[in-house]
Amino acid sequence: MRRVLAGVGVVAAALLAGSWLRPVTAQEGANTPAFYTEKVRPILQTNCGKCHFDVNHKGGLSLMTKASTLKGGRDGVVIVPGDPANSVLVKLIRHEGPPDDPKPMPPKSPMISDADIAVIEQWVKAGAAMPNDPAQ
């Protein structure tokens, strides 16, 4: 009888613990500065760095810091946190810019891979979290 009760206790404890624990979804992981540092920044540096990192800020857009990225460039804001469909950056890397001035990005280079675009969309949808310090 004690073994049965002990077994029931173990099962009950496992079920109770399981109700508090849940897997972290990909979307939740994307809302952290670490996701930006590990996944997004390398994509941006590889594909956008020549024109929008370091001392180059074509179109007035610098992707170096959180503040400058969220500020946008001469044409306005490029990222709407939580809304990839209305984020100009997402539209341009998908080559879906406005018909009168499409600005496909990166210019004169192959289109960013679908997998990398999906990472950027996921990051923007999750709120576009970035570290405050670009060195992080």
Place the predicted regions along the sequence by residue.
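Sec-dependent signal peptide hydrophobic core
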Residues: 5-12
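Aromatic- and Gly/Pro-enriched helix-to-coil junctions and flexible linker segments
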Residues: 4-5, 17-136
